[in-house]
A protein has these predicted regions:
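A short beta-strand motif characteristic of beta-propeller blades
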Residues: 55-64, 99-105, 149-155, 190-196, ...
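Repeated scaffold domains used in trafficking and secretory/extracellular systems
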Residues: 67-74, 107-116, 156-166, 197-207, ...
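Short loop/turn segments that connect beta-strands within beta-propeller blades
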Residues: 95-99, 145-149, 185-190, 224-229, ...
Length: 358
């Protein structure tokens, strides 16, 4: 009776059971296929977001003057990216007028470069960061978007300084075995190679040519054509810390007490800009800022590009002279803070960089 009742009550029971069994057979492949499709879409989107557009060979990431002074400030399209000394050197951004100050990273940065939609810099969290990732020290050459997102390590090695040149970052790579050598890595990390075994400072660059001084047999001015990575002699002088600006190479004259000179790439002439002994300098569009080395009257100085009208910016010893379109930033030697600034052109007015303290 129960069997007869069940068979008549549910005459399609065996059919339904068969359909259910069939569904069980295809539902797993459908789920697996859906998950695979989602993974493919995620990877495609991630690849698109991580894509680094090509740069023209003329693109450079920062000025030689800024990079020779630590690369603590870099500017592009009205935005300034800087290593905030008031917050352990962490990466910040702001407008050129020092408004809209924003923290971008949780680690100390230097040698800041900007090109296109990306930032390139040396990052080191040895001074302390936040979160589990900072339990172990990490350092290296990094790339991120302009807002600090999508952080990517291009080379987990120590870097002395670096310069963006077109689609490559040229950098002085250092370790205790090989010491300092010049490497380059493509901005999308697809290529990395040794450029030279010698110590080459890549900071001074124009239109794909890196200008650097010799460090082994002489202190001549050399050019490195990044299109072929070939080296040639530009000027047989005795110079240090070359900086390119408007067809001139500004440099410290080693043979004459480190006075500041400039060499014309147009007519191959040399001009003496000051007889002061110079510790460091930076060249802007209107003025040269330099630290005068003097036992009696050390001072941060500025003068016009041809060496005329020298004037004192601040008495004492200063370092880390970085220039933006609005201000010249610097700090006292041996002291990270306070950071001072003065308008990069116009009347001198030295005040603390208070916007960075907020």
């Amino acid at each position: 009776m129960p069997t007869y009742y069940n068979n008549n009550r549910f005459p399609f029971g065996p059919f339904v059971k068969g359909v259910f069994e069939m569904k069980k057979k295809w539902i797993i492949p459908v789920i697996a296929g859906s998950l695979l499709l989602i993974l493919v879409i995620v990877n495609v989107v991630n690849a698109f977001l991580s894509r680094v557009p090509s740069n023209d060979i003329s693109v450079t990431g920062n000025t030689a003057g800024n990079l020779n002074n630590g690369g603590l400030f870099a500017e592009a399209d009205g935005k300034v990216y800087f290593s905030n000394a008031y917050d352990g050197g962490r990466l910040y951004s702001m407008n050129a007028d020092e408004t809209e100050v924003k923290r971008l990273t949780g680690s100390k940065v230097s040698s800041i470069n900007v090109g296109g939609k990306f930032l390139y810099y040396y990052m080191d969290n040895s001074n302390g960061g936040t979160g589990f990732g900072y339990v172990i020290r990490s350092f290296g050459l990094y790339r991120s978007r302009l807002d600090g997102s999508r952080l990517k390590c291009l080379d987990r090695s120590a870097a002395v300084t670096l310069q963006l040149v077109g689609d490559y970052v040229y950098y002085q790579r250092y370790n205790n075995k090989d010491f300092t050598k010049l490497y380059k890595v493509k901005t999308d990390k697809s290529e990395m190679q040794l450029v030279s075994d010698t110590i080459i400072n890549p900071n001074a660059c124009n239109n794909g040519t890196i200008y650097f001084n010799g460090t082994e047999k002489d202190h001549y001015l050399y050019g490195l054509d990044t299109r072929t990575d070939s080296v040639y002699t530009v000027y047989k002088g005795n110079l240090w810390f070359p900086a390119y600006h408007n067809n001139y190479i500004y440099y410290m004259d080693v043979s004459s007490n480190y006075r500041l000179c400039r060499y014309s790439l147009i007519d191959n002439t040399v001009e003496i800009l000051t007889t002061d002994r110079v510790d460091t300098f930076n060249v802007g569009d209107f003025f040269i800022y330099y630290q005068k080395n003097s036992a009696e009257s050390p001072a941060l100085m500025r003068m016009e590009l041809d060496g005329s009208n020298p004037e004192v910016v601040a008495e004492g010893n200063y370092t880390n002279i970085n220039l933006t379109s609005s201000y010249a930033y610097f700090n006292a030697f041996g002291e990270d803070t306070p950071v001072y600034r003065t308008p990069v052109y116009g009347n001198i007015n030295v005040t603390p960089f208070t916007a960075a303290e907020q």
